[in-house]
A protein has these predicted regions:
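Short acidic, flexible loop segments centered on an aromatic residue
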Residues: 193-218
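Hydrophobic residues positioned within well-ordered beta-strands of beta-sheet architectures
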Residues: 182-184, 200, 237-239
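Hydrophobic helix-and-loop "lid/oligomerization" segment in the mid-to-C-terminal part
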Residues: 1-26, 31-48
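Short beta-alpha connecting loops at secondary-structure transitions
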Residues: 3-7, 49-57, 117-120, 214-228
């Protein structure tokens, strides 16, 4: 059901035919992706009828009941992407390093798996990107001018929409040299007309010395989710982490 060179993280012919059928009959379409891995959504540009995408990872027996509440507007979504969605998966470090790489000197560690009724030997993967795994690769490559971010990334790490809007204001940063704690407040205000929750994401960009230790330009160090805020309501979130975390 796939063309040569395509993967199961792209549209199959059956899936594309289904999308063609729906978009040919409706002007406003919401696409629901029920999968655990990042999918290649480059096809969205071909379907202006698709107005929104909901990522609903496998959520067990009751997950789709919750999804129904989100689609109906009863529950305001507040989740954020836990990985980077790119426009061409074949160009990712993951795709180019993927394979079955087996050790040839660990026979004593081979174990039988009842799941596949076969023997499983220890394997490994070469991470050619080093520490720049996931979002760190794309954020750093963009900052260094190695990629065009908008041409490469479809949905960034930590991205997510809501039925309302929020404003975040960061307070002064405090540092306790004795405990090594870094702290500050972030005031989140619901500026829309629907109740909802927001997520405060804190990243740091360490100084880099040419020829020194490799460092990504974006590193998630902490995140906090607010309570459900009514329109116009605010909440001050306290952020605190150790300097060793950087």
């Amino acid at each position: 059901d796939f063309q040569k060179g395509e993967s199961f993280l792209q549209l199959s012919k059956t899936e594309r035919d289904m999308i063609d059928l729906v978009t040919n009959n409706f002007k406003k379409v919401t696409l629901i992706y029920n999968g655990a891995n990042t999918f290649q959504f480059d096809f969205l540009k071909d379907y202006p009828q698709i107005k929104s995408v909901v990522w609903c990872p496998p959520a067990g027996q009751t997950g789709f009941s919750a999804l129904g509440e989100v689609l109906a507007g009863k529950t305001n979504p507040s989740g954020k992407t836990s990985d980077t969605f790119v426009k061409d998966l074949s160009q990712t470090p993951t795709a180019n390093n993927f394979g079955s790489f087996m050790y040839d000197n660990v026979k004593e560690f081979v174990q039988h798996s009842s799941f596949g009724n076969n023997d499983v030997s220890p394997s490994f993967v070469n991470y050619s990107e080093g520490i720049y795994v996931g979002y760190k690769f794309y954020e750093t490559a963009s900052d260094e001018g190695l990629i065009d971010y908008d041409d490469t990334v479809q949905y960034p790490f930590g991205y997510g929409l809501s039925y309302t809007s929020f404003d975040q204001k960061m307070g002064d940063v405090k540092y306790d040299a004795k405990s090594g704690k870094i702290s500050f407040d972030v005031t989140v205000t619901n500026t829309g007309d629907k109740s909802g929750k927001d997520v405060v994401e804190v990243y740091y960009n360490p100084p880099y010395t040419n020829g020194g230790i490799e460092k990504a330009t974006a590193n998630l160090v902490d995140f906090k989710k607010t309570k459900e805020l009514k329109p116009g309501e605010s909440q001050t979130v306290k952020v605190e982490f150790d300097d060793d975390d950087m």
